[in-house]
Amino acid sequence: MSLPEIKYCPGTLAEGHSTYSRTCLNRVFNGHSVQHVLPYDSPATNQETDDLFAENRKRISISGVQEKFSVLLEKNKLRLINEGEHGAYILKPIPGAGKNADQMPANEHLTMQIARQVYSIETAENALIFFKNGTPAYITKRFDVKEDGSKWAQDDFASLAGRTPQTHGEHYKYQGNYLELIELMKVHLPAYKLEAPKLFKLLVFNYLFSNGDAHFKNFSLLETPMGDYRLSPAYDLLNSRIHIEDKDFALDDGLLPRSQAKGTVLQQFYLLAQHAGLSEKQVDDILKGITSGQNKVASLLGASFLSEKIKLNYWQAYQTRLKKLTQIHNAI
């Protein structure tokens, strides 16, 4: 694979850039003039590269099925961490399994950019980056790392719920329903009323963009400079249907406990919002915002690094979900 011709910023997807735009460099790389090409071939390219990534693989402690590598920024260069070092970035190459696996980095990058640019959802800073052989990878800046290298405390919702593979089995991340996230926030977050609308908006976004892998570990609370907690920036957003045959929701019971999960998906969203203490106006405003922005979505999709075939699949999935939300919403 050769390096692609770059016409859009691989960070913001803004037109007219042959590498990262100044906006992207400021947001993602603290203003450093980082190149969009890494000084490595992709994993499994040759023995030397393989050994390098195998060493790094032992050092990263973030769980998940997709391989992730820890990277730090040294002057204007990104490199894999050495023993005893702590990375400020996570690098996610093309995974070794899954349908359309080569599209996963561009899928996650696009979905994260749509969340931020179209719907003003706070997200982890991110960009697309390329190995020397032209293979793409997704890179994201860790929001739990301070400027001095120390860490903000972060608790994902599986930890808050006391769920581990030992206590709840291998499927622990996917058990239950999204109402449980709301209830956990009420217990652990004094600023709950400020954060609940953000969580609700993110859940609607995940539905609209077919993110069927939004499990308990993909939501977190993050320590603030004041020493209290808030909902962390969104992360791991992508259209999972492009890669696996997925359900509408990651959690086994969907939005609500099975005893309450009646009616259309939109009626269930309204009931979930009621449990969360959101007013009808708040819900209407969130739904109105989330079901608008088609032109902006189309523009970012067109600028994205997805293949033309997958761009079409992505758009069709979005339109199908949008129709479900808008038709029913207009009827209520």
Where are these regions (language model features)?
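Regulatory N- and C-terminal appendages and interdomain linkers associated
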Residues: 1-49, 55, 228-229, 298-332
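Conserved kinase catalytic-core segment
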Residues: 103-119, 176-243
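ATP-dependent phospho-/nucleotidyl transfer catalytic cores
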Residues: 132, 137-208, 256, 268-271, ...
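A conserved long alpha-helix in the C-terminal portion of kinase-like catalytic domains
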Residues: 194, 245-297
